[in-house]
Amino acid sequence: MIKFELYKNRKTANIVIDKTNLKEKDARGIRRVAQKVCKDVERVTGVCPVIGESLCRTENEVVVAVLGKTSDTDGALAAELIAEMQMDVSSIRGKRESFLFVVTEQRLLIFGSDKRGTIYGMFHISELMGVSPWVTFADVVPERKDEVYMTEIG
């Protein structure tokens, strides 16, 4: 089973947002949700991930991207990773509010079919860590963890 190390030994994976094919307001929305997910990771681990826009390729990274309606309209980073990994994204391309959650040893790829699908994919990380959607409104405190892994099964 493939496991992606989101947090271990006081170190979290960085979050990389591919915004090359996004309108500015959509990019702001994706970044805002990425910040909320970072806060959820911090609630569980005590360490807040860094958000960036380019791959490091030497450390674990969560890559977030909105796919275009066609492969010609994908973001540059998404297109590169899809080609590099020979991924089939046809299951979500052109659909509404869908996402792919792809786990590799060094990357967790979250590809959304649109902005909302990408947001759902990012919040899936919080859900898998055991963070309640009520954490902000009802002071529901998530359980602290020494290690956080994402697996290919979710």
Label each residue range with its predicted role.
Residues 1-154:
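Contiguous, structured surface segment used for ligand recognition
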